[in-house]
Amino acid sequence: MELELLTKKTEKIMNNENYKYNDGGRADAGYKGKAGDCVVRAIAIATETPYQEVYDGLKEANQEYADSRRTRKAKKIKSKGTTPRNGNYRDVYQPYLESKGWSWKPTMKIGQGCKVHLKADELPSGKIICRLSRHLVAVVDGIVNDTYDSTRDGKRCVYGYFYNPSQASN
């Protein structure tokens, strides 16, 4: 039974033309195992920046955030360490992306309900970074680039996305 489920899941992923396996250069940078580094991966893929460069930049941004604030998030960063390996707060990665020339485009408001899903026909073309529930993912011309298919069969809600105004017409 388990093998049958695994086979069906693998077959579903293999047949999804809207998904491409992409670790953003994580393996090439020498990292192994699993990690909650979706922010690093998504930024590396969408900006075409080496994984290690993004990792180091976010680590530095985490350190600056933790050192310059007295919030719960800053204290949590200090206590768990500044590594972006196991997640990043939006308060850190959004200014990082904005410093690279990227802009935020919300796709829903509080209490509004989902209007845009993680589907090619509902997203702009070009390179974007979509914010989902507890996840960031790079989408390149409608193709989800990630270590797993996070589309939920096109039903996953997109809260908004980052885009580079100089690259595309969003």
Residue ranges and their predicted role:
Residues L6, T10-A74, P95, K100:
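Active-site nucleophile-adjacent alpha helix/oxyanion-hole segment immediately C-terminal to the catalytic cysteine
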Residues N15-N18, N22, N62, N86-N88, ...:
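Detector for Asparagine
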Residues R134-H135, V139-N170:
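Active-site signature of cysteine proteases
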Residues E2, K20, S103-K105:
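Short linear interaction motif-like sites in intrinsically disordered regions of transcription factors
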Residues A27-D28, R90, C157, Y163:
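Polar low-complexity intrinsically disordered regions enriched in Ser/Thr and small residues
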Residues M14, P124-G126, F162:
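N-terminal hydrophobic targeting segments
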Residues Y65-R134, V140-G142, T147-D149:
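Conserved active-site-adjacent core of cysteine acyl-enzyme catalytic domains
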Residues E2-E4, E11, V137:
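Acidic, Ala/Val/Gly-enriched low-complexity intrinsically disordered segments
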